[in-house]
């Protein structure tokens, strides 16, 4: 996978994740019945809004999966852009195209990037499901 990563920021984040897992390994475990993806985290993490904070951020937008993901995905893209001095659009490209990752709102209360294969493989009810209840 690293051979296909040409962006230096993306490459460093992938190498950092690999090094952490090479040294410590990782275990998928559950918290309150949901998988915690922290062991597979790539790059930074950002605290996700509480239900009250999310409702305030949504304002007059419809309360649905797309509008919720728009807010949380923007949070991780903006953090990546801020940390690495890049645009939000380039951050989105780094996440999806360079790293082949998905933004994941974890049971731990943070959003971060995880490899797409893991996000699809480990069945979970994420943040969006919890917020729509």
Q: Which ranges hold each PLM region?
A:
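Nuclease and nuclease-like effector domains acting on nucleic acids or nucleotide cofactors
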Residues: 1-102, 106-133
């Amino acid at each position: 996978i690293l051979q296909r990563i040409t962006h230096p920021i993306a490459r460093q984040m992938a190498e950092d994740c690999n090094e952490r897992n090479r040294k410590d390994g990782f275990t998928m475990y559950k918290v309150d019945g949901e998988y915690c993806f922290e062991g597979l985290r790539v790059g930074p993490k950002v605290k996700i809004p509480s239900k009250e904070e999310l409702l305030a951020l949504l304002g007059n937008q419809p309360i649905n999966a797309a509008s919720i993901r728009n807010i949380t995905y923007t949070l991780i893209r903006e953090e990546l852009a801020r940390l690495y001095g890049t645009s939000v659009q380039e951050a989105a490209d780094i996440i999806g195209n360079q790293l082949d990752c998905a933004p994941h709102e974890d049971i731990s209360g943070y959003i971060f990037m995880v490899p797409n294969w893991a996000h699809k493989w480990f069945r979970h009810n994420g943040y969006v499901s919890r917020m729509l209840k």
